[in-house]
């Protein structure tokens, strides 16, 4: 039968004579219990015939810390103020704790009384470890600008535990580049770098439990850097690209940047309506010669960069020649007699059907840029500023020799001929 301790009983217990020669030790089993485990505080070194035990959960023999008193002869156990409802004293003096909680962590004292009314005291310590919940990685921001912003990561966990950090799944070296707080729960990087973009996790652990957070993904904005213009299958010397007449050319703008930059193209200093990373020239002519500039802009870093190339007709294309497009037109089609390498200082030109004589003149272009029809004009011919001639809706009688005559501002005259073939419809 459990009897409450009277004031007189407590007086007797406090008046016991201490036996200083005793060596009582207390060890928990299991040695590293997890919350919820059943734990026994096993007593070693008891000697002689004992009358009673007092268990304390605290640093001193104070009534406040008394868990229970136990009378050996009767088996009576009396709970004390520190009893949680989970403790029970064994006849051998050991203390059972059912479903131990982290709050049971601390110093335990066993006080014994023998028949000579001498007391012995033993001390022990027990650490009850929590089953850890997953922590959370928190950041001051998950999208930062390189070399401008500061990164702060915090591993948030309600439980005291050791902390490890992981970057892209691998253990993060101890503060090689990132400053770590003394408790390991905060990482700080002033002037964050692009190499530090990726997935961060933290892991909390104790001897009985390990738990890792979900990844937190960090983006670091940078650039644009190393802006360059690339091209496919053309001859390039330094910043000059040479292209054959009537050939196509694609210019690509590349840059190192996060996020991908916005692109603006300019031709001879004038902006083009093209927001793509590439620029196409479908058919190279003298009108396409000039300086092409790509400007890359990063909306996050507010930085920009540019690159330029000079595009020219190749040397082989400079000599004036006439190329029909298409090269083998059929009856009913339109054909353009495209002029390659026409004079840059052109004053006037004239097209003839056959030899360059007035009756054969199809049309002429005046210095004003307008063209006028000649005696041989059929109403299907159109002239262009680059000296090209369009003949619409071909018939078989359009086949034959065509002559182009040009006059420059310096008075230089050139004559060039081409033979046009028209295939009949099948």
Swiss-Prot record:
GO function terms (MF aspect): identical protein binding
GO biological process terms held by the UniProt record: sensory perception of sound
Record: glycosylation sites: 38, 217
Family annotation (SUPFAM superfamilies): Immunoglobulin (SSF48726)
Cited Gene3D superfamilies: Immunoglobulins
Position of the signal peptide: 1-22
Ig-like C2-type domain mapped to chain residues: 134-219, 224-310
Composition-biased stretches (Basic and acidic residues): 84-95
Biological role: Required for proper hearing, plays a role in maintaining the integrity of the tectorial membrane.
Subunit-level organization: Homooligomer; can for homodimers and homotetramers. Interacts with TECTA and TECTB.
Entry protein name: Cell adhesion molecule CEACAM16
Organism encoding this protein: Mus musculus
Gene that this polypeptide is encoded by: Ceacam16
